[in-house]
Amino acid sequence: MWDLAQQYPDTTPESSPLHETRARERRSSLVDHRPLKRASSLSFRIHTPCDYSSGASMTSCTSSTSLSSLGSLSSSARQLIMSRKTSPRHPTRLKTRFFSPFHSTNTSPVSPRLLETVEKLSIDNDAHPIFEIPEIVNLILHYVGHDDRERVPTEHAPVRKPPMSLNHAKLIHGEQGEKVWQRTLSTSSTAPPTGNLHNCLLVNKLWHSLTLEVLQENLYFDSDFKLMNYSPPRIAAPKSFVLHKLKSTQQRDLANLHINPVNLEWLEFYICPKLLPSLHLYTAKLKKLVLPGSKVVDDVYLQQIAPLMPNLVHLDLRACEHITDAGLYAIGTHCPKIETLNCGRHTKGILVTDASISHIVANCNLKTLGVAGCGVSDAILWSLAYQKGHQLERLSLNSCWRLTDAGISSVLMMDRFPRLAVLEIRRLTRLQQLRPIVEFKKRQMRRKIAVLVEACEELEARLRAEERSLDLEISTRIFEDISEWLNGDDLQDQIEERNLQQFVQRRSVLV
């Protein structure tokens, strides 16, 4: 309580009736004019925690929450509540009070649907005091928000890429090929999941403020309309910032977001051809950078940002056709922790060659490499085999026109990729020897590694024929071994008889 004597000094004796009357009037004015916190129509509602009372609008506050339910808490939690929430006048009661059902002074009719919604949102006054501790509520909200992070629009890697034609689908899936092909042609999609965290905004003021903080940890926009209508806080410090397929948004529209990169670990502009992340977003904490389909990212930009993100682990630069060996060489120099690199493209593949990829292979901790459509040669495969072969897990070589049997077939024959699980070799027209690829698949299956080899329709047909030929050879050898084992006794008797005759002949010569 405020010290009224200090705020309003008075020379009137305290024992006089005039003094008591003036003090009562001043105390009433303080209560009537005390500033209220700004609240929305639903945040100022039933059972919202309050730290003050204000005249007639809050005269329906119930008595302070009892501490009788603290017995089930640990001593540390009980001490935390008591030190923060106890009232100086009543040590056995909590300071925080709850509103009884709110009745508006407005005489205008209220929608029955709104009344029903408010009734559903009602919370019992006897709620456990543990839900008033911000630290515990924050842990609960992070647990609830775990599913909410799945709503971030990302491109999920398919189990295998869709077939290129009906015949290709039948080669891969057999009798189910026609159904798979029809599913590939369809455009059906599932409805996006609803966010659980948004329901937590409607609990009370404490939950509302903490939920806003959790929601600000992951900023993502999958439409231009949502981005234009976003009202950011004064400064947002998210862990992830994702823009997904924004075609109309301009670069100047991003200046109003006020992103603080102090916590930023994931930065993604997926198919946003006109947008370029600001340089201040790149810090040593950034681990994932995804910029596919950009028409503004070039070598100069990569050379500027590469020294700023030494801890980068995931880099996706697919279809960035203005990037050449110069930009990728800077990435290989300043980002040694990269495990996943995808710089595949459909056009201008000659701009990315062995000069930059070999430098990245030598300096980075690669586990996944995608160079589809690039002008790499067989030398890159040998470099991968001897430097990163023991840890490589995924390799995409689609449409690499310079690759031959001297690279893929020879390296696989030597078993230099013991952990490789995904190999993409679509549209490699210069491949002739496919037996090493089939043997590689069987070798990985014996290691209990589920291997996936993605090939085009022509290569898939040849691989299936090679698999049948190899299976026939294996079955023939098995049959020969069984026959030899069954006839092994007769053969052993013949050998022993021949050895005996030779021994007798030698003895006769000696005699």
Swiss-Prot record:
Residues 1-34 are annotated as: Disordered. It holds the Pfam family LRR_6. The keyword Ribosomal protein does not apply. It is found in: Cytoplasm; Nucleus. InterPro entries: Leu-rich_rpt, Leu-rich_rpt_Cys-con_subtyp, LRR_dom_sf. GO terms for biological process: cell division; SCF-dependent proteasomal ubiquitin-dependent protein catabolic process. The keyword Glycoprotein does not apply. Residues 17-34 have a biased composition (Basic and acidic residues). GO terms for cellular component: cytoplasm; nucleus; SCF ubiquitin ligase complex. Keywords: Cell cycle, Cell division, Cytoplasm, Mitosis, Nucleus. Belongs to the AMN1 family. Negative regulator of the mitotic exit network (MEN), required for multiple cell cycle checkpoints. Required for daughter cell separation and chromosome stability. Involved in copper sensitivity. PANTHER family: F-BOX PROTEIN YLR352W, PARTNER OF PAIRED, ISOFORM B-RELATED. This is Antagonist of mitotic exit network protein 1. It comes from Ogataea parapolymorpha (strain ATCC 26012 / BCRC 20466 / JCM 22074 / NRRL Y-7560 / DL-1) (Yeast). The lineage of its organism: Eukaryota, Fungi, Dikarya, Ascomycota, Saccharomycotina. The gene is AMN1.
